[in-house]
Amino acid sequence: MSKNFEWVTPDSDLLERESTKVQPPKLYNVVLNNDDYTPMDFVIEVLERFFSHDIDKATQIMLKVHYEGKAVCGTYSAEIAETKVAQVTMYARENEHPLLCTMEQA
């Protein structure tokens, strides 16, 4: 079976259209960045609440943020990554923390 589609014009001529390959969406890493003011417990809470990490995984990521300056929380399509960044940023500001959450292409 051919992957091309056949179309009939009003004049009964057959036209062939090449099938196009759909590219998978680009993925983006959501990244938490270290600061000197946001408590470690709050970072763990963010990781559990917005990224569904269990306490052990959240603690590992929090320690990586603390010691290495930043860490990836998850990898998502652009729209979901943007939403996660906005949610984390809003939640941090509501709780008066300067936690910086960004996204970068994976």
Curated annotation (Swiss-Prot):
Listed GO biological process terms: protein catabolic process; proteolysis
Family named by the database record: Belongs to the ClpS family.
Quaternary structure and interacting proteins, as annotated: Binds to the N-terminal domain of the chaperone ClpA.
Record function comment: Involved in the modulation of the specificity of the ClpAP-mediated ATP-dependent protein degradation.
Encoding gene (name): clpS
Sequence intervals crossing the membrane: none
Source organism: Vibrio parahaemolyticus serotype O3:K6 (strain RIMD 2210633)
Name of the featured protein: ATP-dependent Clp protease adapter protein ClpS
